[in-house]
Amino acid sequence: MLRRPWLPIALALFTACASSDPKSTTGTFDPELEKQEQGKLDSEAARNEFHAVLLQMDQALDSYVRAVSNSGIARYDTEREQLDRLLRQLVSGKPAGSTTDKLVALAGDSADTYRQGIALAALGFADRSDAMSVILQGAQLEDEQLVDRAVLGLAILRDPRTPPGVIARVVENEKHNERGRIGAAWALVHLQENSLRADEILPVWLHILEGDKDQHPLLLANALRGLGFTRNAKHAAIVAKYTSHPTPRVRMNAAIALGRMNAQDQYESLLTMLGPGETTPNVRLAARKALQQLAGNVDRGYDVALWRREFQRGK
């Protein structure tokens, strides 16, 4: 008769099961354990959702910066307005302010600098009185990328109380990356007309424009814009030097600045920009508009002789 070797194995398994702890097989429902596990799942889902929102903010911020850099072009101006609304909604969250609270906490957390940078820039769209002080701390960190993100946030926020000196240090720091310095110069221009301390910004523009003319054209262009916004013809001679700069954007901003300053003594510099030597249409148009401002809205088109007669008649 054949033996059945499975019998002792089955008996051994049965014995092992019978001798095990009965609690492990009872299937007793533990509501507290389920609550803990559900809490873990909810927390993980919330973290994933917030991370997705951060990524959306980051992409929107990049698009916003691109749109701002192309200001004056209709489709980019429209895009900027749309992105502004989107980012304000994302930063606020649902319920209102809930995402802002998370961003404030994240802005001071250096454990993940990528997320921290997004928070510092995005808080520029926050509707909270304490946002400026939070972003300002980021602008004084040692990490250049975080500083650049924070400067962007301060520019967007446009809080009149923002200390210009923090951003000015970035502009004037030649060891800082060039793109960051240009961004900081743009930020100062953006803050200038709304600032309670605009007098602290003027020396920055003078330092740039009285320095090396071979500096990055965008740095010079922002300095010219800023000096133009002072609407003070006292520094018009400094601006006039840049009407012959090799970069069209610099020449254009020099012309616009002279118009805003109502720099009557510099009309000859503007007339030169109307002549055959100037081949960039936008520069010629800027010079023409500046001459109109100097002449009390009189327009002589692109006729240099008529413009010269207009200004000589007024003497």
Language-model regions, residue ranges each:
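Terminal, low-structured helical/coil segments at or just beyond the last alpha-helical repeat
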Residues: K289-K315
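Amphipathic, non-transmembrane alpha-helical stretches in extra-cytosolic proteins
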Residues: D30-I73, D77-Q82, W307
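Amphipathic alpha-helical scaffolding segments comprising HEAT/armadillo-like alpha-solenoid repeats
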Residues: M57-N70, G93-G108, R128-Q140, D148, ...
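Structural detector for internal amphipathic alpha-helices that build alpha-solenoid repeat scaffolds
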Residues: F50-L55, G72-P95, Y114-R128, Q137, ...
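Bacterial N-terminal signal peptides
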Residues: P8-T15
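Bacterial Sec signal peptide processing site at the extreme N-terminus
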Residues: C17-E34
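Bacterial N-terminal signal peptides that target proteins for export
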Residues: M1-L7
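Short inter-helical turns and helix N-cap capping residues of alpha-solenoid HEAT/ARM repeat scaffolds
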Residues: A111-D112, E142-D143, K175-N177, D212-H216, ...
